[in-house]
Amino acid sequence: MTAAENVCYTLINVPMDSEPPSEISLKNDLEKGDVKSKTEALKKVIIMILNGEKLPGLLMTIIRFVLPLQDHTIKKLLLVFWEIVPKTTPDGRLLHEMILVCDAYRKDLQHPNEFIRGSTLRFLCKLKEAELLEPLMPAIRACLEHRHSYVRRNAVLAIYTIYRNFEHLIPDAPELIHDFLVNEKDASCKRNAFMMLIHADQDRALDYLSTCIDQVQTFGDILQLVIVELIYKVCHANPSERARFIRCIYNLLQSSSPAVKYEAAGTLVTLSSAPTAIKAAAQCYIDLIIKESDNNVKLIVLDRLVELKEHPAHERVLQDLVMDILRVLSTPDLEVRKKTLQLALDLVSSRNVEELVIVLKKEVIKTNNVSEHEDTDKYRQLLVRTLHSCSVRFPDMAANVIPVLMEFLSDSNEAAAADVLEFVREAIQRFDNLRMLIVEKMLEVFHAIKSVKIYRGALWILGEYCSTKEDIQSVMTEVRRSLGEIPIVESEIKKEAGELKPEEEITVGPVQKLVTEMGTYATQSALSSSRPTKKEEDRPPLRGFLLDGDFFVAASLATTLTKIALRYVALVQEKKKQNSFVAEAMLLMATILHLGKSSLPKKPITDDDVDRISLCLKVLSECSPLMNDIFNKECRQSLSQMLSAKLEEEKLSQKKESEKRNVTVQPDDPISFMQLTAKNEMNCKEDQFQLSLLAAMGNTQRKEAADPLASKLNKVTQLTGFSDPVYAEAYVHVNQYDIVLDVLVVNQTSDTLQNCTLELATLGDLKLVEKPSPLTLAPHDFANIKANVKVASTENGIIFGNIVYDVSGAASDRNCVVLSDIHIDIMDYIQPATCTDAEFRQMWAEFEWENKVTVNTNMTDLNDYLQHILKSTNMKCLTPEKALSGYCGFMAANLYARSIFGEDALANVSIEKPVHQGPDAAVTGHIRIRAKSQGMALSLGDKINLSQKKTSL
C-alpha cells in the first residue's frame, strides 16, 4: 500500500499564518512549562510529525517530562503521539525508549479511571508492533472483567485486533471471548464479542446463537443486526443451514428496531423464495415506509419493493399487497407518492383493480378539499394519470372513474384539467358504450370551464362525438349560453353605453352621437369620455376569451359548429330545420369575425383564425360530400390512428421490460442440484454485505465488457510522450460521484528520481480530494499513484498538471514534465429518461439556458443521423417511432435525459435533407439544447460538436 492508501486515523488542521516552532523551544516548553504549555507544545509536535518532520530528539524528553503527568487532556494527546511517532529504527528494530512507553501503557491499562483504560485499549487496536503488545496481554485480559462496560467492550475490540494481526500472542482468543459472551449482560459488549466470533471462529458464534435463538427478540438492536449478518453469511456459504435459521429471521421481522427489520427482510428475501417469506418481507417493508418519518428512508425501502416486483415469481405475491402499498399515499411527499402510485399501477390486476380505483377516487376527492398547494396540484395530476392508465388497461373501470374526474375539467389548475381532458378524449374514442355518459357529463361542466385550453379541447370532443339530434341541440344551446348576447359588437357597445348611467339621478350634459369605425353609433357621456370597465367575471366564458383576444378558440368553435351542423343536416329531414340550424351556426361565426375585426378585443384576430372561420362558413354554405367526409370521418380517424400508435408503443416498451426481467435458459444450460453441488461452488451468488461495503468505500465494480480492450484499456489516457524522462499514463475509473485516476509513472532514465510528485489541478466543477504523496523512483522503476477527484455536477471537466522531480546527486533545479489534459466525459453521468409531452413542453418553457448547435456532418440519412446523436448524447428519443418512420425530406424529434445529480436536459432535433442537391446531399439543420444550468447545455453542445467532427472525418 502507498502512503496515500493507508488508513488515516487523525486529521488535524494546520494553521498557516505562523512560522513552525523550533525543536529547542518545544523541548524547553516540554521540560519546564506548566501543564498548559506542555499541552500546546505536544499539539505542535504532533502536527509537525504529521507534516513529515522526524524530531527524534524530543522522544526522550516527552517520556521523561510528559508521560508521567496524570492530566486527561495530555493523556489523550499522548495516545495520538504514540500512534504517529516512528517506533522502530531504519532497520526495523524496536527503539529502546519504547520499553519505557510500554510500561506506561501497562499502568494506564490498570488505571482506576475507566475512560483512561478504555481509551488506551482503543489505542492498542492501532498498534502494529507485536513486541509492544506482548507484555500487555495479561493486563488486556484483566480488562474483560472490569466493572464498567466501556472498558469491557474496548477490551474485546483490542483482543480481536491483536488476534487478527498477531494470533500467537493470544491463541485462545475465540474461546476466551465465547466464555465472556455467555456471561455478559451489556448489549454493546455482547455485540462486539459476537462480531469477533463471526470473523474469528464462526462455529463458536453459531453454537452461541443456537443456545439463545429463542431469546433473540429480547436482545438489543445492535446485537440483532450482527446476528442477521451472521445468518446471512452462513446461509450464503452453506445453503443447507437455511432451515435452521430462517425462523430466527422471521422473528426478527417483529423487532422494535427499524434497522433490524429492514436487514431481516432483505436477508429473508435472499434466503428464501417461498411466497410466505416474500409476503412477510414485503409486509415488513410496507410497515417501515408507513412508520418512518424520513422521506429518504421511505424512498430507499420503496426501491426494495420495486426490486422484489422485478422478479416474476415475487410479483404475483406482491399483487395481493397492492391495497397495503396504497397506505403509503398518506405520506405528503410527492416523490414518495409518485413512486408508490407507479408501483401500485405495475402490480394491479383484475382481482384488485376495483379496490384500487375506489382508493384513488377517494384520494382525488381529498385533493379537492385540501388548501391549494403546488404539490397538491401535482399529486392530483399523478392520480388522474394513474386512473387513466387503469381505465385503459381495465375498460370496465372507466364508467366508475369518468364522473369523478370530469368534475376537474373546471379546475383552476390547468395541468390537472388537461390530464383529465386527455383521459376523456381517449376514453370516448375507445369505449363506445361510454360516449353518451361522457357527452352528458361534459355538457354539465362545460359552462364552468375556466381555462381556454381546456375549453378548446371540450369543444372538440363535443363536436366530434355528439351523434343524436338532442345532443347536437344541447351543444348549440351551451355555445349560445357561453357566447352571450349576439351580435357581440352591438351588444357590447350598448352595454358600455348603458353602464354610464349612475345609480342616482345626476344632471347629465348633452349627448352627441358618434360613429364608430365599424359604422355603428355610440353614445358618449359629458361626464367622462373614457370607457368604463364592468366586472369581467360577469361575462360568459367564451365571450370573455374572445374579448381578451384569444381567437384560436373561435377557430376551434367554428370547426365544432361545422361538424354538428353537417351532422344535424344528415339526421333531420325537414329542410326548414336544417336551414335554421345551419344559419344559426353561420351567424355565430360571422359575429365572431365581426368582433375580431373591431376594436373591442384586447388583441385583433389573426389571419390564420380568419381563414379557418371563413373556410368553415364556405363549407356550410356549400355542404359538399367531400367536406362532409373530411369533417365527420377523417378527423376521428386521425385520433384513432394516434391512439393506436401510442398503445402499440406502450405495449412494445412493456414487452422490452418483461424480456429484460425474464431470465432465458438455453436448452443445453446445466441444471444445478443443491444436494450435488460442491461447497466451493455454492458461493456463486454475490454477497450482499460485501457489495454494500464496496459501494460505501467507493469501490463498486461496474460490469465490464468481456473483451478487456473494449472496457478498461479504452479508458487509458497517455499523459506524457515515450521520449520524456518520466512516462505516465492514467486509467480513469468513473464512480457515481467521484473519479479515481490510477496513474502509472515510469522512470525511463538511469538516475534515481527523488521527490517525484504528481501535481494535479482541475477546471470545471471538479475538486481534487487530496494531494498525491511524493515518491522515489529507482532507475527504470515504476509506481502507481492514485488520485481522487470529486464531481458535483454534469459539466465538462478537465484535469491537468505535471510531474516534478529531483535527480539524485544533481545540483540543478527541480525538473518538470507537463502532462496532457484529461477530459472527463459527461456521458458517464447522463442517463436516458422519459417524460410526457406536457412535462417536456413545461420544462422547455421554464429552462433559461439554450445552446443551438448547427448540424455539420457528412451523413446523408436523417434517421441514421438521429441515431448517431442519441448514441453520442446518451439521450432518449421521446418522439414515437411511427412519427419518425417514412421519408419526407425533413425530421423533428424531442430528446430527453437526466443526470445522476437530478439535472434535466432537453433537446429538439430539427433536420432536413435538401432535395434539390440530389440523393447524396448531407443532412442539414440544427439541434437546440435546453437545460436549467449553463454547464449542462454547453457540455451537451460540445459533445454533439465533437461527435459531428468524428463523422465528418
Swiss-Prot record:
UniProt-listed Pfam families:
Adaptin_N, Coatamer_beta_C, Coatomer_b_Cpla
How does it get modified post-translation?
Proteolytically cleaved between Ser-528 and Ser-529 by CAPN8.
Q: Which residues carry this modification: N6-acetyllysine?
A: 494
Q: Which domain of life is it from?
A: Eukaryota
Q: What is its main location?
A: cytoplasm
The chain residues annotated with the modification N-acetylthreonine are: 2
Q: In which tissues is it expressed?
A: Predominantly expressed in the upper one-third of the oxyntic mucosa and in most regions of the pyloric mucosa. Ubiquitously expressed including platelet, liver, heart, spleen, lung and kidney.
Q: Where in the cell is it found?
A: Cytoplasm; Golgi apparatus membrane; Cytoplasmic vesicle, COPI-coated vesicle membrane; Cell membrane
HEAT repeat intervals: 96-131, 132-168, 240-276, 277-314, 316-353, 396-433
How it assembles, according to the record, is: Oligomeric complex that consists of at least the alpha, beta, beta', gamma, delta, epsilon and zeta subunits. Interacts with CAPN8. Interacts with SCYL1 and PRKCE. Interacts with COPG1. Interacts with ARF1 (myristoylated); this interaction is required for binding of COPB1 to Golgi membranes. Interacts (via trunk domain) with ARF1 (via switch I region); the interaction is direct. Interacts with KCNK2 (via N-terminus); this interaction increases the channel-mediated whole cell currents and promotes plasma membrane expression of KCNK2. Interacts with STX17. Interacts with TMEM115.
Protein name according to UniProt: Coatomer subunit beta
